[in-house]
């Protein structure tokens, strides 16, 4: 039993009224009188200590999923072709289930917006899996795309380019190191078109993205190249010095990170070629070479000869 004040017409003092959750009754603790019964408990039948637990244990189904065109609110007919007992359906019932699925898909995707979102969310999931993006980034990208649809920004533009732009914006917002070239290579749209859509989203949706930090790219590039933690640390220190000297302003963060890693790999005798680093970083060899020259000259870094 837990104490809970209840405003009822009774001589029982309010602070003496308790609620019996098991029986659904309000009782006066002084007299034992049942003041009100048959109370329906509209709360959950479980306990949760965090918002995440509360969402997972909701009795009304799974949590909303922004990466599904209808946010996962509709039901789905399973594709396993098995009945409720787990037995495989016979050929006749299998054909019936196939027809039901077709009609269900038609019912779920009726309007042009539904069709647009369904195609876009499939594209988002495909690119997200290829880039190994976490769910939080895909959710953020889905929200950005939905806002673009609501404002009519997709009309007259390819779904692929807007989805790619939304993914890039989400990566920037979540401080996940992914370049525009890296995302664009997995779409039919070219980089120029994706960049144009990205600028449109920032302008029309008022999406705020933090300034990219070259250090955000260091860990990922170094891991892909199999470099040590010492190389990562030195590369980060080089970037910090470059910031202090004003060398990072207006420069591509991925290119700066690539050059810093190249310098650090030489200093620690874990040599990688400029071509190898450029490919992993998603920049050109020329960019790595130019940033390398700037950093070594301006910061007076001496590279040991082989």
From Swiss-Prot:
Asked if Transcription is a keyword of the record, the answer is: yes
KW Repeat (keyword) present: yes
What Gene3D superfamilies does the record tag this protein with? 1.10.472.170, Cyclin-like
Query: Highest taxon of the source?
Result: Archaea
Q: Matching CDD domains, A to Z?
A: CYCLIN_TFIIB_archaea_like_rpt1 (cd20549), CYCLIN_TFIIB_archaea_like_rpt2 (cd20550)
| Matching InterPro entries | Cyclin-like_dom (IPR013763), Cyclin-like_sf (IPR036915), TFIIB (IPR000812), TFIIB_arc (IPR023484), TFIIB_CS (IPR023486), TFIIB_cyclin (IPR013150), Znf_TFIIB (IPR013137)
| Coiled-coil intervals | none
Annotated keywords: Repeat, Transcription, Transcription regulation
The record's Pfam families line, in alphabetical order, gives: TFIIB, Zn_Ribbon_TF
- sequence repeat ranges, renumbered to this chain: 122-205, 216-297
* One annotated GO biological process: transcription preinitiation complex assembly
Cellular-component GO terms for this entry:
transcription preinitiation complex
Which GO terms of the molecular function aspect are on file? Answer: DNA-binding transcription factor activity; TBP-class protein binding
Q: What does this protein do?
A: Stabilizes TBP binding to an archaeal box-A promoter. Also responsible for recruiting RNA polymerase II to the pre-initiation complex (DNA-TBP-TFIIB).
NCBIfam families for the chain: PRK00423.1 (NF001658)
Similarity comment: Belongs to the TFIIB family.
Protein name per Swiss-Prot or TrEMBL: Transcription initiation factor IIB
Please name the source species: Saccharolobus shibatae (strain ATCC 51178 / DSM 5389 / JCM 8931 / NBRC 15437 / B12)
């Amino acid at each position: 039993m837990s104490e809970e004040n209840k405003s009822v017409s009774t001589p029982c003092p309010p602070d003496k009224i308790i609620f019996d959750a098991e029986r659904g009754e309000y009782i006066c603790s002084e007299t034992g009188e049942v003041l009100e019964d048959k109370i329906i408990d509209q709360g959950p039948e479980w306990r949760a200590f965090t918002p995440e637990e509360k969402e997972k244990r909701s009795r009304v189904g799974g949590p909303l999923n922004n990466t599904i065109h209808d946010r996962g609110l509709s039901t789905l007919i399973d594709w396993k072709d098995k009945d409720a007992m787990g037995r495989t359906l016979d050929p006749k019932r299998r054909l019936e289930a196939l027809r039901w699925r077709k009609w269900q898909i038609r019912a779920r995707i009726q309007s042009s917006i539904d069709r647009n979102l369904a195609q876009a969310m499939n594209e988002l999931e495909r690119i997200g899996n290829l880039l190994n993006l976490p769910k939080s980034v895909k959710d953020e990208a889905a929200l950005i795309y939905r806002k673009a649809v609501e404002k009519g920004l997709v009309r007259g533009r390819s779904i692929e380019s807007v989805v790619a732009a939304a993914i890039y914006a989400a990566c920037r917002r979540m401080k996940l190191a992914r370049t525009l070239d890296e995302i664009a290579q997995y779409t039919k749209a070219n980089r120029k078109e994706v960049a144009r859509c990205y600028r449109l989203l920032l302008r029309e949706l008022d999406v705020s993205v933090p300034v990219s930090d070259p250090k955000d790219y260091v860990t990922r590039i170094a891991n892909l190249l199999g470099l040590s933690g010492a190389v990562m640390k030195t590369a980060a220190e080089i970037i910090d010095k470059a910031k202090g000297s004003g060398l990072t302003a207006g420069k591509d963060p991925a290119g700066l990170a690539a050059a810093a890693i190249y310098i650090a790999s030489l200093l620690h005798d874990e040599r990688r070629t400029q071509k190898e680093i450029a490919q992993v970083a998603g920049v050109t060899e020329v960019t790595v070479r130019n940033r390398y020259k700037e950093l070594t000259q301006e910061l007076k870094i001496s590279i040991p000869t082989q």
